[in-house]
Amino acid sequence: MSTAVQVDDVMRYRDSRFQTIAAKLLPTQYLVVDDDTALTTTLGSCVAACLRDPVLKIGGMNHFLLPKGQVGDGAPTRYGSYAMELLINDMLKRGAHRKRIEAKVFGGANVLKGFTSNPVGTRNAEFVRQYLQAEHIPIIAEDLCGIHPRKVWFFATTGRVVVQRLPHAHEAEVAATESAVRARLSKAPVTGGVELFE
């Protein structure tokens, strides 16, 4: 059974490429599934972590915009630190074992103009690597940084990931979408909480 536990509903559609139902995650969203749903997202400087318990065959994906933020700084799910906790905790609630969780991480492209000295994409990529290392969750595959936006499909039951690097023509569109979400979220009130599991 697939359920979105975030306030915003995740859009589902029939993916003709893979002949399955796909759930499209937007920035700040995450989803955990235990069926054949393809989790998909489009990434520029944002990062998506795909986590999986290979024994239980459940997994999830998140999509975050920035590594860390301050409490009271708008929607907390835009920050990797919060988005990672939500994803891990949801998997643990569904029976995943922390020691079996493995990760595949994607995104962190440097597509936002004006961030040349400390690019958001690079910071996001560094954050997700450091976070997973600190949590003792191995990264078994990654496609991070670079200059190209990506579209990612993750199949939790098998662990398969398909990454399509998008041509330069998509950079402006992806960057504009990410910037618009950042602007909207900077005005959003803080909601929700995190329950930590040891």
Swiss-Prot record:
Query: SUPFAM superfamilies, per this entry?
Result: CNF1/YfiH-like putative cysteine hydrolases (SSF64438)
What's the Enzyme Commission number for this chain? Answer: 3.5.1.44
The chain's coiled-coil residues are: none
Q: Name one GO molecular function term.
A: protein-glutamine glutaminase activity
GO biological process annotation, one example: chemotaxis
User: What EC class does the entry list?
Assistant: hydrolase
Gene3D superfamilies linked? 3.30.1330.200
Origin superkingdom: Bacteria
Keywords, in A-Z order: Chemotaxis, Hydrolase
What does it catalyze? Answer: L-glutaminyl-[protein] + H2O = L-glutamyl-[protein] + NH4(+)
According to the UniProt record, which cysteines are disulfide-bonded? none
The record's HAMAP family line, in alphabetical order, gives: CheD
Main function: Probably deamidates glutamine residues to glutamate on methyl-accepting chemotaxis receptors (MCPs), playing an important role in chemotaxis.
- Which protein family is it in? Belongs to the CheD family.
Q: What is this protein called?
A: Probable chemoreceptor glutamine deamidase CheD
Supply the source organism for this entry. Xanthomonas euvesicatoria pv. vesicatoria (strain 85-10)
